[in-house]
């Protein structure tokens, strides 16, 4: 596909002209240009979102590590619940 010469390019141009015609060709080229611009902006937006997600995940990973270390160091409170029978008949 990389070896397109002048005759091949002329043939492609003729086929495009036959398919779209002289009148519709500028509109078709304009719509292709708009589509390419939208596609490029979406790709760059996805790259930016991916970079932000990496920064956020790296920060949350550090926070998770700190949280997990600190949660094992502190004693957990214990709660005891008395039943109704124990309240009526103390031992």
From Swiss-Prot:
Ranges of biased composition (kind: Basic and acidic residues): 43-55, 82-91
Transmembrane segments: 2-22
Location(s) in or outside the cell: Cell membrane
GO molecular function: protein transmembrane transporter activity
Superkingdom assignment: Bacteria
Keyword Lipid biosynthesis part of the UniProt annotation: no
Stretches for region Disordered: 43-91
Listed InterPro entries: TatA/B/E, TatA/E
Gene Ontology CC terms, in alphabetical order: TAT protein transport complex
Keywords carried by this UniProt record: Cell membrane, Membrane, Protein transport, Translocation, Transmembrane, Transmembrane helix, Transport
One Pfam family per UniProt: TatA_B_E
Membrane topology: Single-pass membrane protein
Biological process per Gene Ontology, one example term: protein transport by the Tat complex
Location, primary (coarse class): membrane
Function: Part of the twin-arginine translocation (Tat) system that transports large folded proteins containing a characteristic twin-arginine motif in their signal peptide across membranes. TatA could form the protein-conducting channel of the Tat system.
Family according to the record: Belongs to the TatA/E family.
Subunit structure of this chain's protein: The Tat system comprises two distinct complexes: a TatABC complex, containing multiple copies of TatA, TatB and TatC subunits, and a separate TatA complex, containing only TatA subunits. Substrates initially bind to the TatABC complex, which probably triggers association of the separate TatA complex to form the active translocon.
UniProt protein name: Sec-independent protein translocase protein TatA
Gene that encodes the chain: tatA
């Amino acid at each position: 596909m990389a070896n397109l010469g002048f005759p091949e390019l002329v043939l492609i141009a003729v086929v495009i002209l036959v398919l779209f015609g002289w009148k519709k060709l500028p509109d078709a080229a304009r719509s292709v240009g708009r589509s390419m611009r939208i596609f490029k902006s979406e790709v760059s937006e996805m790259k930016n979102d991916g970079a932000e997600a990496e920064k956020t995940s790296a920060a949350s990973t550090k926070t998770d590590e700190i949280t997990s270390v600190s949660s094992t160091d502190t004693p957990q409170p214990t709660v005891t619940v008395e039943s109704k029978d124990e309240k009526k008949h103390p031992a």
